């Protein structure tokens, strides 16, 4: 395995199972941004104490508490040139959530949710995650929950933007 694949496999494994060990992968001086379809300000953690509650739901193993059982799978990982000679890793991942009561406040009604995302890690000189930026593709999840989000295919020949205008 490559360095990037090893890092990604360890990271998703700990996200799925051990919050304390996952938090330990991060540097004390950190910036964690988890972007979905919400304001980034509420999603930015700069201390391990702020990070821990953001990661904790992913390691939940109680199928009856409404938090859900989450599973991340790293599908691809690439090492990139980082800053100050330290590596960066970009991770493409799949996520499944089962047994969740709500997703961003929307009732899940027993559905198993799935999406994909991408995470970038800038590592420090000790190999700890100093900066993380994560992007979730929330659109298919919210559509699965019957939220009316349009995803027009603008690139298709003959697309008519007037079809998006309400009558």
Regions from the PLM with identified roles:
Residues 1-167:
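C-terminal and inter-domain tail/linker signature
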């Amino acid at each position: 395995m490559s360095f990037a694949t090893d890092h990604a496999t360890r990271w998703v494994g700990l996200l799925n199972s051990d919050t304390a060990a996952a938090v330990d992968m991060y540097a004390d001086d950190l910036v964690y941004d988890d972007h979905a379809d919400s304001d980034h300000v509420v999603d930015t953690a700069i201390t391990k104490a702020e990070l821990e509650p953001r990661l904790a739901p992913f390691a939940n193993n109680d199928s009856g508490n409404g938090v859900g059982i989450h599973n991340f799978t790293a599908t691809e990982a690439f090492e990139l040139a980082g800053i100050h000679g330290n590596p960066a890793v970009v991770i493409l991942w799949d996520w499944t959530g089962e047994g969740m009561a709500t997703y961003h406040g929307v009732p899940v009604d027993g559905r198993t949710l799935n999406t994909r995302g991408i995470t970038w890690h800038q590592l420090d000189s000790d190999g700890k995650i100093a900066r993380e930026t994560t992007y979730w593709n929330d659109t298919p999840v919210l559509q699965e929950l019957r939220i009316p989000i349009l995803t027009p295919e603008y690139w298709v020949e003959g697309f008519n933007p007037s079809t998006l205008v309400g009558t």
